[in-house]
Regions:
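Non-cytosolic head/periplasmic domains of membrane-anchored proteins
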Residues: 102-201, 205-206, 212
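N-terminal Lys/Arg-rich, disordered targeting/topogenic segments
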Residues: 1-20
């Protein structure tokens, strides 16, 4: 007798097999996608950086190379322990001196700001509520605050000052040690605009107004004391930076003048200038201020090395962009040139570069030229 086949049952079985097969395919795709997502911090930076480095190591340009920065706009670069830290929109990339990528770390800071010393980098975002400190090997610590961050400062020994807004006071100052432990807090009645560490305390630059003009007042506090140790007289200028001197005094670079103070807050000397402040730097009790006179298409370099005398002045018939101090030498990014000077105003070197760069870094015998979306290394002339 012929075998009877249930056609309807057979069709149902085939449909179930097809549905099961489709389900397994979809499940595999979902699992693979989940695996990619959970491991994105490992593979995405590598994809993001494909084609980002162009090496140029021929005989004519020995030691030179070019890094292309993903995203370009608003990146920030500094050297930390001979490693180039490049802060971008979502990641911080760490390169060795030869342009080889050593590490890439994700951060969650919008419009991130980076402050560095010789060994570490402080990362935060203006109006954010968290900050972190990294070194070349790893992120060391991250802290969260209740109020929005105005700015942060990283000391040479790794201490961190964070200034936040406040609903009750003008602002709040938080001091952390090098391990991330909170060691000091202060509710401030005046608005802080800059902070410079000085021994076991810090010099705070506050801004206010007198007779309708902006003034800067310095206050020195010690972390073991609640009272302010000294307060300076008002300086009729908007402070850009305050720097601690080795003798316990301070040097202020303002928008219209500079000022020296002794270790009790008394004004020693000040110097007023006409011109717009472009850039400044300070190291080892010596300062450099770069000004521009737009109407004359002229730049002015002021060199400060002695609190008792006026600065050495150097003039340029072009608009310069950036000034750096390293090993007691001033490096100036001119229009299509890098110049170097001693603090006596003597020009030590000058060589031409592409004019498409906005900032210079120097590490060892190399210059690192920062442009819109690229970083070029070149030897110093």
């Amino acid at each position: 007798m012929a075998k009877t086949v249930d056609v309807v049952l057979l069709r149902e079985r085939r449909k179930r097999k097809r549905r099961l097969f489709r389900f397994l395919i979809i499940l595999a795709v979902v699992l693979f996608g989940a695996l990619l997502y959970t491991s994105r911090e490992k593979w995405f930076p590598k994809l993001e950086k494909i084609g980002s480095q162009h090496a140029n190591l021929n005989a004519e340009t020995e030691g030179e190379f070019m890094l292309t920065v993903s995203g370009g706009v608003d990146y920030h670069a500094e050297f930390v322990n001979n490693n180039l830290f490049v802060l971008c929109d979502k990641y911080i990339y760490i390169y060795d001196m030869n342009g080889e990528l050593q590490d890439s770390r994700q951060h969650a800071y919008s419009n991130a700001i980076m402050k560095t010393n010789q060994d570490k980098a402080l990362l935060y975002s203006h109006n954010g509520t968290s900050f972190r400190v990294d070194n070349s090997k790893k992120m060391l610590f991250e802290e969260n605050l209740d109020d929005s961050i105005w700015f942060g400062v990283l000391s040479d020994d790794g201490r961190v000052a964070i200034i936040t807004g406040s609903e009750t006071y003008a602002c709040c100052l938080y001091i952390y040690d090098a391990t991330g432990k909170l060691i000091y807090t202060r509710n401030c009645l005046e608005r802080l605009i800059d902070v410079s560490f000085q021994n076991q305390g810090c010099i705070c630059a506050t801004i206010g107004s007198e007779n309708g003009e902006v003034v800067t007042v310095l206050k020195y506090i010690q972390f073991q004391e609640s009272d302010v140790q000294w307060t300076s007289e008002a300086l009729p200028a908007l402070c850009w930076h305050v720097y601690s001197m080795k003798d316990g005094g301070a040097f202020v670079i303002g928008d219209t003048k500079t000022a020296y103070y002794n270790n009790t807050g008394d004004l020693i000397n000040s110097y007023a200038y006409n011109g717009s402040l472009i850039d400044c730097d300070f190291f080892n009790n010596q300062g450099a201020v770069l000004l521009k006179n737009e109407s004359r298409r002229q730049s002015i370099l002021l060199l400060f090395s002695d609190s008792s005398t006026n600065p050495v002045t150097v003039y340029f018939d072009s608009i310069c962009k950036n000034v750096k101090i390293q090993d007691n030498i001033i490096y100036l990014l001119d229009a299509g040139k890098i110049r170097s000077y001693s603090f006596t105003g003597t020009e030590l070197s000058c060589f031409e570069i592409n004019d498409a760069y906005e900032k210079i870094l120097k590490n060892g015998k190399y210059f690192y030229l920062l442009g819109y979306d690229r970083i070029q290394r070149m030897s110093g002339g």
